[in-house]
Amino acid sequence: RFNDLMQFLTEWPRQTAPIAVEVRHLEWFRPAQADRLNDWLRQLGVGRVLLDSRTMYDGQTHGLPDPQFTSERRKPNVPLQPVVTADFCLVRYISHPDLNFNETYVTKWVPRLQAWLAAGKTVYLFIHCPDEAQSPAIARYFYDTLKGAMPDLPSLPWDEIEPPAAQLSLF
């Protein structure tokens, strides 16, 4: 499979359409395979999706209910490998619906993101949750935590949107 992936990525028009790869099979996370993959991605300037699903599985060890109990498809339970292989990185943070449970994980992400941004990397941060109604609040919490460490970060675009006018009553 490695050769198939490398052939695909070699032929991909990376200069006009940057791409990142998310691997899920545990074989890709074994040290020899991970090093080989990361080296090749660096050579090509291809990003690696940094999937962080730890909250999905760690919460149960802290007595919290399984946030994926009603999910049709469970999130991959793979080791986090915070390796940047291109001039950008894509962090896919799968949050726990309990905002407070995310604090430890978010706090640990901040220095990494700071370092990558200081090194001139572009960081794409994709945050979602099995209970998608919680995703906006968790995304805001994550960004506010990062902004607390990096006050020069711009405001989130949705902070600039004027609230809609209140609808007048029809009766």
Give short role names for the model-derived ranges.
Residues 1-171:
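Residues lining hydrophobic/aromatic ligand-binding pockets adjacent to catalytic sites
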